[in-house]
From Swiss-Prot:
Membrane-crossing residue ranges in chain numbering: 4-24, 63-83, 88-108, 131-151
Catalytic residues (positions): D118, D136
Catalytic activity: Release of signal peptides from bacterial membrane prolipoproteins. Hydrolyzes -Xaa-Yaa-Zaa-|-(S,diacylglyceryl)Cys-, in which Xaa is hydrophobic (preferably Leu), and Yaa (Ala or Ser) and Zaa (Gly or Ala) have small, neutral side chains
Function noted in UniProt: This protein specifically catalyzes the removal of signal peptides from prolipoproteins.
Topology within the bilayer: Multi-pass membrane protein
Biological classification of the source: Bacteria, Bacillati, Bacillota, Bacilli, Bacillales
Name assigned to this protein: Lipoprotein signal peptidase
Recorded name of the encoding gene: lspA
PANTHER family associated with the record: LIPOPROTEIN SIGNAL PEPTIDASE
Pathway(s) where this gene product acts: Protein modification; lipoprotein biosynthesis (signal peptide cleavage)
Molecular function, one GO term: aspartic-type endopeptidase activity
Similarity remark: Belongs to the peptidase A8 family.
């Protein structure tokens, strides 16, 4: 019999991502000055200490009140979506857990520091991609998983 909710797996995913996110940000914040950069893979990956008081790519910079409200709303919506729409679907539940952990990780930064610590600095095919962190990666992967789950669900109904 299929389980309705995979709470243990969902919690393990969310807590693991949250811990990795917060620990890596703490390491960067306490061991590097803003702007310091270390090359990891030449012409591809650097660890660069950066702060962002906006959203992705620095949009809405300095609008912390907005981010507090919207993040709380998003976290509530994710919990409701998990309960109502992700029954019996482990893949969807993991996707929601990734989104929840990513949103919560950056929310903690904004709440505690008034800004988000970013440090993964990539250059992909000559494009200097905006600096990001583990929470941002979790959000991106979570969105991709949601899209895959929705497409798979739509195809199975045809």
């Amino acid at each position: 019999m299929k389980k309705k909710y995979y709470i243990t797996i969902s919690l393990i995913v969310a807590i693991a991502i949250l811990i990795i996110d917060q620990v890596t940000k703490r390491i960067i914040a306490t061991t590097m000055n803003i702007g310091d950069s270390y090359e990891v893979i030449p012409n591809f990956l650097n660890i660069t200490s950066h702060r962002n008081n906006g959203a992705a790519w620095g949009i809405l910079s300095g609008k912390m009140g907005f981010f507090y409200i919207i993040t709380i709303v998003i976290l509530i919506v994710l919990v409701l979506f998990y309960i109502k729409e992700a029954k019996y679907n482990l893949f969807m539940q993991v996707a929601i857990s990734l989104l929840f952990a990513g949103a919560l990780g950056n929310f903690i930064d904004r709440l505690v520091n008034g800004e988000v610590v970013d440090f993964v600095d990539t250059n992909i095919f000559g494009y200097d991609f905006p600096i990001f962190n583990v929470a941002d990666s979790s959000l991106t992967i979570g969105v991709l998983f949601i899209i895959i789950a929705l497409l798979k669900d739509a195809n199975s109904k045809e």
